[in-house]
Amino acid sequence: MGHDDAHVEAVERAMVALRRSQSRRTLARLAATRRRATVAAAAPGAGVEVLDAIEEAEESGVPATVTSVAAALGIDQPRASKLVAAAVAAGLARREADQADGRRALLVRTPAGRRLSAEVHAFRRQVADRAMAGWSDRDRAQFARLLTRFVESLGAMTR
């Protein structure tokens, strides 16, 4: 295994560990230890992920739909439809008629969904801040830059 292969292997292992550390169960345990259980348990099923997908669409200026949620989450449309329905039933999102195409429903976050999104972002940032406790500002900046670049490269591969 060459020098570069060892680095790629280290990244792959770190990605697996990161994915495990971001599971609903792990985050719920962490939230409970930080007395933030409402953040981890407030959304049904993958409700937080649905809110993330809708928020991403809102920020990009492209209306969110079940199809865009499915693409963002990497799941099929029937599964996305069920997750969206659960988020709507929980009062976190709502469907609105597309004024340009009445057959299409657009998804938007409700005020409750926006509040939950803000809470989740704050919680995730606290977790990241805690994980980087003791890091220098330079290390934090370098990590943020490299991780962002890595994620952008991964995204470009799937488009």
Question: Which residues fall in each region the model found?
Answer:
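Key DNA-contact positions within bacterial/archaeal DNA-binding proteins
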Residues: 78
